[in-house]
Amino acid sequence: EFTHSLKRFFCMCGFTGFYLNHEKSMLDLENIVSKMTDTLEHRGPDDKGVWCDPSNGLALGHRRLSIVDLSPSGHQPMSSRNNQYVIVLNGEIYNHVELRNELDAINPGFKWNGHSDTETLLAAFEEWGVEKTLDKSIGMFAIALWDLRSQMLTLIRDRFGEKPLYYGWIDSGNDGKIFGFGSELKALRAYPGFKNSISRNSLKQ
């Protein structure tokens, strides 16, 4: 009980990923994002997962610190029931039980896979859309959400920006400019060709 309370206090999952916007082999994507995800092992020692969309060059990786749902059903990256969304989440949705109750009232008999707030968010995205769901959500969180229908990547943070989220363009050479993101900068540095230097032009701005 004490250990679980500490987990809730620190709430340190971690995720990373990148978007090429062009086709790349599944093997290459998995190898790269797996190495990026490994840099975040200290944030999530309980589980590791990766998910890739080779047709778009999109890769997501997650390190899990089990907080709400300790079972394998809380594994991330997680896909929605209708296969429209894939999500990685760092943080906690405090009112996810209330959101579940509201969803259960709309869809009686809906069977949940587990008790994770991540699954609750995905079901809410399906029912209400992303913006309305976020309006209803209370918590501390950083999210990367891939919409397979619109082929759009959305990065999300809580209103106070409590959970870290770094992102930017990486000049990777062969792949051109890629969009990378992660819970820590070290995850971005693990991308091949990443240049660990400061842009003086950006500093001037």
Model-derived regions: residue spans:
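Cysteine-centered catalytic environments shared across enzyme families
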Residues: C11-Q205
